[in-house]
Structures are given as structure tokens and as C-alpha cells.
């Protein structure tokens, strides 16, 4: 490229959120007052077209909440184009955990107790594929749970407790977030 790069690929990302207020308790009807309730839906998708093999940080990871695409109920980076693999598994190389296409959705019922504190119930679903042409909505991994978020002077902190439905041993996973997460 004209900036000295050797890559010949295009990375496309898209996301959208839709939130609907569904009620308020207290606050005398004033905006931002009392306890507020909302329903939200967030969709995210991304794809890499071309050869990004030499550029792993332009490809996608999925699972957990800290790296790559969020999917609560699963350990970090355990959702792969080849299926679910535990971290440090000898059955898959780290580079094979990356995909060139992903899709995720989150449905959430959020409860804002104040401008600094929120609670929520959520349902996440997502998938990761080697190639955008492999995308199929029938192969999404699912998680659901409860979460809380507090806004501090250092940024938002969150705690989510999520159930991963599609793991070899389905079960609960605790996630700690140190950045802006889903909704709430």
C-alpha cells in the first residue's frame, strides 16, 4: 500500500443498538430520576475479505468479555471457527482461534438504579467463522445471565454471571469488565 503495508484485505465492521424505555419508578416523572427500565437489542458483525493471515490483530476472537468479541458464559477466546476449545488446549493453535467473520447479538433488560449503578438480565449469542461465506445463524453459541455495572471516575466496571449453554459441560462463568460493556 501507499503507507508501506503489505496487506491486501478489507476489514468491515458493523454494529447497531436499539433501546426502548419501558418504565420508571419514582423520580416524579423527571428524566433521569428514579429507577428506570429499558429493553435493548445490540447486533454486531464483522468480516475480513482478502488475505489477512499475516495480520492477526485485524482478525476476530470471540468469548468472554475482555478480548475480541464479547460472548458471556464462555472463557476468553474459547469460541473458535473450529468449535469450542479451552484456553491453552493442545488441540488447537492460538492462530486457529481467529476467524475472518463473526456475528453476535445481545438482548438485554436493563435496570438503572442511578446514573452510576445499573443491573441487567441478558441473552448473548454469537459465532465465529474462518470465512465470511461460512456464516450461518444456526451455529451460534448462547449465553444468558445477570450483570451489574458501576460508573467510577476511572471508567465503568462491570460484573456478569453468565450461563454458557453450548459448552461441553454447560455451566456458569463469572466475568469482570473494566471497560464499557453491553447496555446497562
Where are these regions (language model features)?
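Outer-membrane beta-barrel "beta-signal"
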Residues: 146-153, 171-184
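Short flexible coil/turn linkers enriched for glycine and charged/polar residues
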Residues: 113-115, 153
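Glycine-centered small-residue hotspots that permit tight backbone geometry or close packing
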Residues: 64-65, 73, 143-147, 155
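A short alpha/beta connector and helix-capping loop motif
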Residues: 134-148
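A short, acidic, flexible beta-alpha connecting loop/helix-capping segment that sits on the rim
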Residues: 162-167
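C-terminal outer-membrane beta-barrel translocator/porin domains of Gram-negative envelope proteins
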Residues: 1-113, 121-125, 129-131, 177-184
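Residue-level detector of the transmembrane beta-barrel scaffold of outer-membrane proteins
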Residues: 38-42, 118-120, 147, 156-160, ...
Amino acid at each position: 500500500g501507499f503507507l508501506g503495508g503489505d496487506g491486501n484485505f478489507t476489514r468491515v465492521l458493523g454494529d447497531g443498538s436499539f433501546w426502548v424505555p419501558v418504565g420508571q419508578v419514582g423520580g416524579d416523572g423527571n428524566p433521569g430520576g428514579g429507577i428506570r427500565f429499558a429493553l435493548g437489542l445490540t447486533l454486531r458483525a464483522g468480516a475480513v475479505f482478502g488475505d489477512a493471515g499475516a495480520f492477526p490483530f485485524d482478525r476476530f476472537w470471540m468469548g468472554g468479555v475482555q478480548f475480541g468479541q464479547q460472548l458471556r458464559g464462555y472463557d476468553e477466546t474459547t469460541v473458535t471457527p473450529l468449535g469450542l476449545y479451552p484456553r491453552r488446549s493442545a488441540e488447537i493453535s492460538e492462530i486457529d482461534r481467529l476467524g475472518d467473520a463473526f456475528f453476535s447479538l445481545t438482548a438485554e433488560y436493563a435496570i438503572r438504579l442511578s446514573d452510576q449503578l445499573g443491573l441487567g438480565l441478558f441473552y448473548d449469542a454469537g459465532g465465529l467463522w474462518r470465512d465470511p461465506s461460512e456464516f450461518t445463524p444456526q451455529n451460534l453459541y448462547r449465553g444468558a445471565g445477570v450483570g451489574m455495572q458501576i460508573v467510577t471516575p476511572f471508567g465503568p466496571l462491570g460484573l456478569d454471571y453468565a450461563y454458557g449453554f453450548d459448552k461441553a459441560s454447560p455451566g456458569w462463568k463469572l466475568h469482570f469488565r473494566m471497560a464499557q460493556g453491553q447496555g446497562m
